[in-house]
């Protein structure tokens, strides 16, 4: 079975989590934490910063590692490394995603997550990361712009 290694940014602002909705492929309309594949010679952190810049035109800071999720899909095995992050600069422009939402802890289960991301949500609820808050003096990431 094909193995894919990816990284995901759990971007938090004022106790809410940023989720994106896929606009393409077999899993179109499913929700996920933004991120992508780790390229050869790239660290996980470098990959995450690059992917968020490419997908959302935003620079993030990585606060801490959260978890690694292994998940079997019909055609591949996914290993996803997740990091708690914050916006450093940018306005979270949706360059690839169909939609995005800021979800507080009580609303994390209101969207149709991809299987691996669903495991991350469960992990967030059980580890106490739902209470994590960061007060930054950065441009307001509340506004999500569409390309």
What role is predicted for each listed range?
Residues 33-65, 104:
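The catalytic Nudix box helix
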Residues 59, 69-91, 99-101, 122-124:
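Active-site-adjacent beta-strand/loop module that shapes the phosphate/pyrophosphate-binding cleft
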Residues 26, 31, 93-147:
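Nudix hydrolase/Nudix homology domain
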Residues 19-21:
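Beta-strand scaffold of nucleotide-dependent catalytic cores
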């Amino acid at each position: 079975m094909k193995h894919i290694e990816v990284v995901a940014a759990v971007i938090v602002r004022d106790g809410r989590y940023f989720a994106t909705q896929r606009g393409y492929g077999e899993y179109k309309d499913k929700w996920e934490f933004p991120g992508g594949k780790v390229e050869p010679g790239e660290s996980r952190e470098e990959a995450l910063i690059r992917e968020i810049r490419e997908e959302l035109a935003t620079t993030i800071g990585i606060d801490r590692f959260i978890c690694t999720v292994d998940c079997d899909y019909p055609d591949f095995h996914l290993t996803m490394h997740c990091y708690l992050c914050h916006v450093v600069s940018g306005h979270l422009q949706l360059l690839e995603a169909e939609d995005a939402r800021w979800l507080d802890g009580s609303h994390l289960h209101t969207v149709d997550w991809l299987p691996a991301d669903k495991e991350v949500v469960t992990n967030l609820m059980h580890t106490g990361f739902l209470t994590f808050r960061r007060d930054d003096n950065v441009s307001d990431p509340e506004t999500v712009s569409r390309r």
